[in-house]
Amino acid sequence: MNIFESKWRKLLEEVLLSHKKHVKDETPIREIIGVNERVDNPYKDSMLNINHKQFAEAVKRGAFDIKYYPIKSEALYDYVTSLDQLDKIVLDENSFIYTYSERLQNYQGRNQLKDIVERLEQDMGSNRAVAVTFNPFLDNERADIPCLQLIQALVRNDKLILSVYFRSNDLYGAFPSNMMFLTYLGMKIANELDVKFDYIDYHCSSLHVYETDYKQASKVIM
């Protein structure tokens, strides 16, 4: 069982058995407020220094497919590598549709991921290598706003930690693919800095499962 599946199963059990119910967007959910988890590099114990491209190819081959998780192989690969497909995205800040890749690499014309790398190249011990996705001038007027709000890259002992904050996260439908996307991002940044990616420091305000997914999610923990 890979790290993404083990974390997914653990958190699904906690959320489904918590009996903490809420109604979100007119849909019942079960949720946990204030979740903090460490999601390790899936190759942490490997003698090989696997880079982001090798990780993506493993995703594409199905090495990280998870039973009962609806997104697999090619679809996972496309999502994970969306950071490298920015030229295929319409770069229009006034459009309704956004992607994390767009907000991170074209936030009002600014490439925040490039800024992170340059900041850490100047000072590897910096706590200032931060990128945001929320745009108050646009998102306060929209129903659909980014779930992932902030990332921070920290280098400690020649290893990169990616600290992330989600305002809201669909545990059953999105958590594994989100973690693979962020692992790819962490590996990509680490590769540019010539350090090893260590882990994701995950923070989420509302981690939840929608009522429509209860039945399928329950199969995961049976």
Predicted segments with their positions:
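Terminal, non-catalytic protein-protein interaction segments that mediate quaternary/complex assembly
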Residues: 1-222
